[in-house]
Amino acid sequence: MDHSKYLLTIFLENDDSFFKYLSEQDDETAMSDIETIVTYLNFLLSLLIRSKDKLESIGYYYEPLSEECKTLVDFSNMKNFRILFNKIPINILNKQITVNKGYLSDFVTTLMRLKKELFLESPEPITYIDPRKDPTFLNILSILHEK
């Protein structure tokens, strides 16, 4: 298994394997590995956005990928709520790195092949600040638009 496939497989697994792996690496290697993950996630995001644009071109509004989409959280199960918003550092000393060699591994292999075949150009990273939601920029814009 090559390194990128290994990284993606442990990253997408629903456990702490990726954190355990990163904790055992030096800073430079960890940052390089994170950059590899970001590259593949950007590819997936680009693929999703292009698909959303195709749907919108025929008049279908795909809300989950839209800019103004609001996420609802189900508060009926407080255990899931705690897991979702738990920002306490993870104790990974006694954890082991597990590599899923089933469907997740197949998905990662397919994703890597698709990325090589499609070669979607990733746009430059852009930070979008919505002045309607940022009071500082809203004030600056109101000053600039005064007559």
Curated annotation (Swiss-Prot):
Keywords: Host cytoplasm, Late protein, Virion. Its main location: virion. Induction: Expressed in the late phase of the viral replicative cycle. One of its GO terms (cellular component) is host cell cytoplasm. The keyword Transcription regulation does not apply. InterPro entries: Poxvirus_J1. The keyword Methyltransferase does not apply. It is found in: Virion; Host cytoplasm. Late protein which is a part of a large complex required for early virion morphogenesis. This complex participates in the formation of virosomes and the incorporation of virosomal contents into nascent immature virions. J1 protein is required for DNA packaging during immature virions (IV) formation. Homodimer. Part of a complex composed of A30, G7, F10 kinase, A15, D2, D3, and J1. Interacts with A45. Belongs to the chordopoxvirinae J1 family. This is Protein J1 homolog.
